[in-house]
Amino acid sequence: MSTFDGNMTRRTALVRGVQGAALACAASRWAPLFAAPASRWFKIGACEWNLGKADPSSLEVAKELGLDGIQVDMGSPKAGLPLRKPEVQKAYLEAAKRTGMGIASIAMGALNSVPLKRDPRAAQWLLETIDVCKAMGLSIVMPACFGNGDLDMAKTDEINHLVKVLQEACAKADKQGITIGLESYLSAEDNLKLLDRVNSPALKVYYDVGNSTDKGYDVLKEIPLLGKRICEFHFKDDGFMLGQGRIDFKKVRRAIEKIDYSGWIQIEAAAPHGMRKDYPAYYKFLRGIYPERG
């Protein structure tokens, strides 16, 4: 997530000529290279805003595309963060049960416009989202820190405020068994500095390989450096089709092997040929590298 704020706003996709069949072919070639231990597992979903939805029907779309589930969002401030409402939570949970789809985590795209680093409303929303996460039987809340919420470690006053906000939120999250996965443009080194200052096991990094590549970071070095402090992944590669751009997802898998990660991978990628064509192809491509189980 970077520019998302309750509505679907992605970078303009760069159309690539190679079709989804090439992705499937590559996945079948790579599959034998990765024999994960039986204890390791991967689920592959998509962010609901990339499915063109902001309601429980996103789970129906995920099922139609052959995914394992979704990352849901709290919703926009203008709409009053709809997921705060018990009836909306219930509707999502009923849709998940009906479709057999999973809900992996809750994103807070609203914090891109109402920043956690200085706006007291954002701090309150984070506390409320922890309660929503617990009520829905989920375990990860993802505050997004882009746009107005972008983090700069050189801006001491903002970072000091953020640390205090996160310490309060983490105290609550830790008691409820919830992880706060902060997503930002910070480097792995700066993420570690921030996590060390907050000093809570409830705070981790929500790692987006596309965002980090955009910033010029080496994701193959950053993933092992962050290690167990990564709680979940976003996969995208600017406007490219997955597997046809800058990021070698086979090498990313090897980096993930080093940290013994099991969990969700959320597709947040461009769809130059349309979401209904490209997302099933992405799933097949990624499944060849990230098997459901070893």
Question: Would you name each region that the model predicts?
Answer:
Residues 2-43, 52-66, 99, 188-294:
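Histidine-acidic metal/acid-base catalytic patches
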Residues 45-47:
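Short, well-ordered beta-strand segments
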Residues 17-27, 58, 93-105, 112-205, ...:
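Active-site acidic/histidine proton-transfer and metal-coordination neighborhood
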Residues 71, 105-107, 142, 181, ...:
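Conserved beta-strand positions in the central sheet of alpha/beta enzyme cores
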Residues 73-91, 146-151:
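Glycine-rich, proline-tolerant flexible connector loops at the mouths of alpha/beta enzymes
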Residues 82-89, 117-120, 276-278:
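Metal-dependent catalytic neighborhoods of phosphoester/phosphodiester hydrolases
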Residues 50, 74-76, 109-112, 145-149, ...:
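Active-site-proximal loop/turn and secondary-structure-junction residues that shape catalytic pockets
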Residues 88, 125, 162-165, 248, ...:
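Hydrophobic alpha-helical membrane-association signature
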